[in-house]
Structures are given as C-alpha cells and as structure tokens.
Regions:
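Internal nucleotide-binding/catalytic subdomain
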Residues: 12-153
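Short glycine-enriched loop/turn motifs at secondary-structure junctions
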Residues: 6-10
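Conserved, structured core segments of small domains
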Residues: 148, 156-160, 165
Length: 166
C-alpha cells in the first residue's frame, strides 16, 4: 500500500496489486508531483473491513461517537480508484463490543495521552481510520477533523446539542 504523505483530498492511497501498478503510482506521486512535493509511505497490505471511529477529545479525555463506514471506491462492487468518499452508513454489524473497547483502550485513548505527553494536546475531533483484520483492529490513519462523509450519518445519532461539546 502506497500513501502520499501530505494532503491529497482522500485520493492519495493506492493499494497496488502488481509491481507495475506500484511503479505507476510512485511515478505519479513523486516524479509527476500529482499532489505536490512530498514523500510516500509504504505500508503492509491489510485485509478486512475498514471503519471510522471519531472521538471528541479534550487533552486525555476521549469520548467516542458511533462507528461508521464510508464507501471509498468510485465504482460498484468496491472497484475502481479511491475517492474522497461516496457515502457512509453506521450500525456496523461486523464491529463487536470487544472491537470497540480495543479501539478505545489501545488506540484512541493512548493516542490522546501521547499527544499530551508530546506537548501537543488536542481539543477537538480525533478521527481513527481503522481496519478489523484477522489479527484484530489495526490503525490505517488518523486525522484531527471530522470524517467526510461519515459525519453525515454519525451526528444525527448524537442526542445532545453539539455546541455544548465545544
């Protein structure tokens, strides 16, 4: 998996299936400067469904929102290039209470705590792009913002006035 290390409007990830696809993606990102000047991160290819866990964070205090899943691919059947998000849904049947507890206790809360320890505390939204693999929940990405389009299906489920959160 090749990821452009910078802003790419949700389109900077290529899951290359062949070396030719990988070379083409690297050429596009680095030599042709598709997203500007930057670097590329090479990651292991993981299998399993992706999901998004957004949390309200104030320092080490982390409050989860409902999990959601977006549809990234341009074509039906999860085919084609990644987009910035074609739609989303929530109430994910494949996520167990244990998965959510792991994501909170081993990913989201430790991340917020580490940000405080590094002198960069977050007050806002921490977005965890996660994947449920055969080996458990893994981190795909983090953002310090609401997920798009996931926010469209998550915010209506929050009972309180969101203005009170901030």
């Amino acid at each position: 998996v090749l990821k452009y290390d910078g802003l790419a409007a949700g389109k900077g990830v290529v899951s290359a299936e062949t070396m030719d696809e990988a070379r083409e993606a690297l050429r596009d990102m680095l030599l042709d400067g598709r997203f500007g000047k930057g670097r590329v991160v090479v990651e292991d290819f993981l299998t399993g469904p992706e999901f998004s866990l957004m949390c309200f964070v104030e320092g080490e205090n982390v409050y989860p929102m409902p999990v959601a899943q977006d549809h990234k691919r341009a074509y039906d059947g999860d085919k084609g290039p990644n987009t910035g998000g074609m739609g989303a849904y929530t109430s994910l049947p494949f996520i167990t209470d244990e998965d959510l507890e792991f994501a909170m206790e081993k990913v989201m809360r430790p991340t917020a705590k580490a940000m405080v320890a590094e002198g960069c505390p977050l007050t806002g939204v921490l977005y965890g792009g996660l994947m449920k693999t055969p080996d458990g929940v893994k981190v795909i990405e983090f953002n310090a913002r609401f997920g798009d389009p996931e926010t469209e299906v998550v915010l209506p489920l929050i009972d309180s006035d969101i203005a009170n959160v901030f």
